[in-house]
Amino acid sequence: LECHNQQSSQPPTTKTCPGETNCYKKRWRDHRGSITERGCGCPSVKKGIEINCCTTDKCNN
């Protein structure tokens, strides 16, 4: 599986995730504004963090 791994509005980058079946995109707000984190897997998140998990190559941009 290939997942995007750039932060927030950085130019898109991807990484290969051997053995993974999910990519994720996580969003939250802090004093700097809205933060977006992308990567492999489907981590559990704390309340107040929005997460989208998906199962196809580069689906988490």
Curated annotation (Swiss-Prot):
Main localization, broad class: secreted
Disulfide bridges in this chain: 3-23, 17-40, 42-53, 54-59
Entry keyword annotation includes rRNA processing: no
UniProt xrefs under CDD domains: TFP_snake_toxin
Subcellular location: Secreted
Single GO MF descriptor: acetylcholine receptor inhibitor activity
Top-rank taxon, per record: Eukaryota
Keywords: Acetylcholine receptor inhibiting toxin, Disulfide bond, Ion channel impairing toxin, Neurotoxin, Postsynaptic neurotoxin, Secreted, Toxin
Tissue expression summary: Expressed by the venom gland.
Task of the protein: Binds to muscle nicotinic acetylcholine receptor (nAChR) and inhibit acetylcholine from binding to the receptor, thereby impairing neuromuscular transmission.
Family the UniProt entry places it in: Belongs to the three-finger toxin family. Short-chain subfamily. Type I alpha-neurotoxin sub-subfamily.
UniProt name for this protein: Short neurotoxin 1
